[in-house]
Amino acid sequence: MTSTSNLIEQVIEAWQNMQAKTPLVQCITNSVAANYTANVLLASGASPAMIDNPYEAESFTKISSALSINLGTPTSEQMQAMQISAKTAQLNNVPWVLDPVGYGPILAWRSQMTDELLQFKPSVIRGNASEISTLAGNQVQSKGVDSTLSSDQAYQQAYVLLAHADCIAISGESDYILSRELDAVIQVNGGSPLQPKITATGCALGALIAAYSAVTTPTIAALSAHIHFAIAGKLAANQAQTMGSFSSIFMDYIHMLDANLIEQYADIKLLDKQA
């Protein structure tokens, strides 16, 4: 039976493997998040490549360690690249993460494109509570791309999405990870209320899941990335209470994370899986 200590051991191993292998992560992401996402990946030990041109997508996805697709500010050309790269990833066993930013009836075009991307079976679907709940077929009133639903409400509605992906990761006050392979739901605690106030933290989290998925299973990848962010947020909040200083120290701890910090500060709980 899975235990929290065993899961944390696997997270430490995943972190060590990422430092050793420096996975190449292709990011098709939004214009707001691209720079921050690249910096988070570099600070974490991965190698980002922001390749979102449809004419280069197939060849680059083939050589990538992992793929991150984020629908934050999609253009027609980006959408072509997303479809090409997602299909290529599926055909070449490249793990990939789908972040359905803003999914819902208000942003209908991107939502239709998100639905089409599901056919290529992402390794992980990551989003906030409103995005995940709406993607699962529930009617949720969102506030732009921000969530109006709590993560503990959303995870109970998200099981249907396991038909499309190996793992579902939901971020919020506590984070929740659902998986085909586990007989429990993982709750990740930590972080800081300041994290959602920094532009692109959620988007960067999706890319970090992709980086970890290059060196471990989808479930441990999602767990590793969420623990990575939760610890960095918690430790940064101990030193800074304002957004500017918090943002800087948060990035420092993204870079400074190590096995000892994971062992000391990882705060996870196993919940019964819905029947």
From Swiss-Prot:
Domain of life: Bacteria
Pfam family, one: HK
Reactions catalysed, as given in the entry: 5-(2-hydroxyethyl)-4-methylthiazole + ATP = 4-methyl-5-(2-phosphooxyethyl)-thiazole + ADP + H(+)
Cofactor requirements of the protein: Mg(2+)
Annotated disulfide bonds: none
Entry keyword annotation includes Translocase: no
Catalytic activity, EC: 2.7.1.50
Keywords of this entry: ATP-binding, Kinase, Magnesium, Metal-binding, Nucleotide-binding, Thiamine biosynthesis, Transferase
Residues noted as binding substrate in the record, renumbered to the chain: M50, A200
GO biological process: thiamine biosynthetic process; thiamine diphosphate biosynthetic process
GO molecular function annotations of the record: ATP binding; hydroxyethylthiazole kinase activity; magnesium ion binding
UniProt binding sites for ATP: R126, S171
Pathway where this protein functions: Cofactor biosynthesis; thiamine diphosphate biosynthesis; 4-methyl-5-(2-phosphoethyl)-thiazole from 5-(2-hydroxyethyl)-4-methylthiazole: step 1/1
HAMAP family assigned: Thz_kinase
Function: Catalyzes the phosphorylation of the hydroxyl group of 4-methyl-5-beta-hydroxyethylthiazole (THZ).
NCBIfam families given in the database record: PRK09355.1
Family of the protein in this entry: Belongs to the Thz kinase family.
Name of the protein: Hydroxyethylthiazole kinase
Species assigned in the record: Acinetobacter baumannii (strain SDF)
